[in-house]
Amino acid sequence: MQESHFFAHLARMKLIQRWPLMRSVSSENVSEHSLQVAFVAHALALIKNKKFGGHINAERVAVLAMYHDSSEVLTGDLPTPVKYYNPEIAKEYKKIEAAAEQKLLSMLPEEFQEDFRPFVISQQTSEEEAQIVKQADSICAYLKCLEELSAGNHEFALAKKRLDITLAERKTPEMDYFLNTFAPSFELSLDEIS
C-alpha cells in the first residue's frame, strides 16, 4: 500500500490565513472559511430547491464547497485585489490553480482519484453547481465584512463595498432569500441573537 500525502496537505488549510493584507478583529483560515462556504452553499441549494423550483443536489454542492479552495494548500491564498488586478493575471492564476488541483488529486491512491476528481478539480463542476459555490463564497466574504465592521473595524469598509457590487452581479432569488433571512444576524451581538 502506497503512502498518500493528500489529507496531510488538506490539514494545512488551517495554516493559511485569509485576508492577509487586512487588519482583522477575528482571524480566519482557509479551513474555517471552507466549512462556512459549505454551510452556505448547502443552504442556497436547499432554498433554490424548496422556494424557487430548483433541482440541485444540495449535499453534493456542500462537498464541492468544502474543497473549493483546497488548491490553496499548494498555492497559498492570493488576495483578491491581486488575483483580479487585470485579466492576464487572473487567467494565469487560473492555470496555476488548475495545476495545483491536478497535483493534489495525484496525491491520492489511484483507486480513489476518480471518486475525488469531481470535488478537487473545479473544471469538473457543472455551471449551476459552480455558481452556487461562488455565490456562497461571496456571501461568506460579505458576512466576514459585516462581522468586522460590527466590531468597529473600518478596515473592511471598502471590501464590503466591493462585495456589495459582486453580490449584485451574482444576484439570484436564493441569494436574496439567504441575505434577507440570515445576514442581519451577523451584525448583532451574542446577547442579541440568544
Swiss-Prot record:
Domain HD span(s) in chain numbering: 30-142
Reaction(s) catalysed (UniProt annotation): a 2'-deoxyribonucleoside 5'-phosphate + H2O = a 2'-deoxyribonucleoside + phosphate
Gene Ontology cellular component terms for the protein in this record: cytoplasm
UniProt site (Appears to be important in orienting the phosphate for catalysis): 18
EC number(s) stated in the UniProt entry for this protein: 3.1.3.89
Keyword Lyase applies: no
Chain residues that bind a divalent metal cation: 33, 68-69, 137
Pfam (any one): YfbR-like
Cofactor: a divalent metal cation
GO MF, one annotated term: metal ion binding
Residues where substrate binds: 18-19, 33, 69, 77-80, 137
Record SUPFAM superfamilies: HD-domain/PDEase-like
PROSITE patterns for the chain: HD
Keywords: Cytoplasm, Hydrolase, Metal-binding, Nucleotide-binding
SMART domains: HDc
Subcellular location(s) of the protein: Cytoplasm
Description of how the protein assembles with itself and partners: Homodimer.
Functional note: Catalyzes the strictly specific dephosphorylation of 2'-deoxyribonucleoside 5'-monophosphates.
Family that this chain belongs to: Belongs to the 5DNU family.
Record's protein name: 5'-deoxynucleotidase VV1113
Native source species: Vibrio vulnificus (strain YJ016)
Lineage, opening ranks: Bacteria, Pseudomonadati, Pseudomonadota, Gammaproteobacteria, Vibrionales
